Amino acid sequence: MSEPGKRQRFSPYKSHRNYRTIRGTDAGLTLRHFDRSRRKYRLFGKLSDDAVAYLLMGISGVICVVLLLCLANCVSGCIHGCTRQDTTSSQTNELDSRVEAQTSQNLTRQFTDVLNYADNITWIAAHAHSYRDERLPELALREQEAAPFVRSILDSSITAPASDISPEQGSMPTCYTWDGLWGSTSYGQGTIATDGSGLVSWYMIRAMLLGDGSQTPVDFAEQAHEYADDTCGTRGEFFTQHAKEAGLSIKEYSVSLDNLKLSCDGDKKLALVCLKEGATSPYQHWAVVARVNKNSTVSLYDPASKKATDATWEQNQLVDKISKLYTVSALS
């Protein structure tokens, strides 16, 4: 402390003092000086520069090999794909060109049936409103085999499939209302295809019991014109009144399981039945029960439904679907 009243004296500035202070020598300290040029951060640790160079060259080589392999694989795939496409395109399925070549014959035929149906039903759907009788497109929807016939009603470029029937006594032919031989013939409120189940059933019965196919459903349509109705399509009186003329004997029975068995027992008698609405189709119609099989099932020949004809029927299952029952045999 300076004495009061006396002017404080300042020593001259000594630059070397400030330097020592900065260096820390005034306080007796010795600072460590880092050489920043020596602080190098190395990616590969203590490896030498030559080792690092060799390592980078190795990695680059591996990457090049991988890229070359990928490129070769892509080129090979493209060549193989083009070759396969050319080979496939040069081959066609002999049975149906719409099905891939080398497909088995059995599978090809199955595809053909479905593809043909798809083609027909698509055409029918596009012209559905043009049909005067809505039951015709309904028939095509319900029965796949009927689609070509239904289409042929409006499409003149299509010929409806027709059966080649050679009636033989003792052999029951399988016939349907939509057959090209008679399906489009006018009958009742529509055609034989929609209303002629009784006429086709009568034809099958005569073919089975008499071996006679001289008269077809077209002929019966003229004979039964007065008997057409909106229930089963044909009234039962047509059969009872024309049986003798046709060389047949017919008798009506009440519907029961016993009477059904009796009506189609053996090869000499057949049962002519009217099936109820909704039994095998949305409408009442006629069908034929041919025989009782060994396993107690019965054979149904339904001219309005291939699905029903192909099915196996238990007797008690079928009898519940019958509204009228006639026994028919050859006139002795």
Model-assigned labels for residue ranges:
Residues 16-19, 25, 129, 155, ...:
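A generic structural signal for solvent-exposed, polar alpha-helical segments
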